[in-house]
Amino acid sequence: SDLIIVPDENKARQWVEASHFFGEKVQYIPAKDPLFYTADVHGNAIARDRMLAIKKIVDDKCGTFVMTIDAVMDQVVPLSDIKNHKMTFKMGETLEEATIAEEFVARGYEKAPFVEAPGEFAVRGGIIDIFPYTQESPYRIELWGDEIDSIRSFDKESQRSIEEVDALTIYPASEIILNQPRIEHGLRNMEEDYEKLSQKFKKEKKYDQEARLRKEMDRVREELRELHMLIGVEGYLPYFYENTECILDYFPEESMIYMDEPKHIRERADAFYLEFSESMKSRLEGGYLLPKQANTVTDYESILYQIEKHKMLCYSILSAEINDFRVARTLFMDTKSIQSYNNSFEQLVKDLTKYQSKD
């Protein structure tokens, strides 16, 4: 697998659209929004797109991915943790219906009366419905006693079966796995930081900040202990995992990294990191978050170190603008910008004829 790094989302979309012309689709891996983890109305769509890409990487399917530098700077869980929490169900195997809901919830799935959207599951009387993030349709697992009797995809509207399969692999609906040991581990780390920061606010007579922090911590405790989930869990990543990774760790060293306009990437990375750091500092001082929540983004110098472990190709309109890397070879290409034809087929034909006559 190869990775294209771009300065912004518009550039990423251009790569995806252009890839259709060449027959091989470039897959977009969106950034998590570290400044607004709890306010992202597109959260499920982002989580699903990211998990689809991660599945492709885990399955070792060759492909090309594109990411903004913001997305590359997001800290992520070790890839091994996602691999270890895939679930595979096979015909004839046994399944504990009593505990399956707990397993799904730990992997980020939401219990519902009926499955209607990706990320939901339902359990009732020997029937388990689940809509994996990595599938186009929900699946129904029917039990005979505690043995899997059938596995089939179905239409969520009509409930009619689409296809029967012998096995089904389900990827998590969240990159952070919240099983009971990890919940306890995360809470211990949070309580430790909470006590220190709470005492600091009290000592400095910052009672509003202390009350705000206490309210947030109460919410976190309640959601984790009662619901076994946490809204905005990505913002608490360092509390649940001692060692986080950069998404570049997901790509083998033989992967090629393409940098589209390195100067613009550097400018965006520096601006993003500054914006993130200032926002986190302000929120920390205001009692809106815990200290380690400010450590969910990797600085650009560390990203460069990771990039240099791979083979690399940089594209820049001005060659003098590549300063972050030692250039081993330079290739110059003559290109021309073209006008927008606005559905004027006649003008397109004229221009093509003119270009052909010059050859």
Feature locations, PLM:
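ASCE RecA-like P-loop NTPase motor cores
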Residues: 1-359
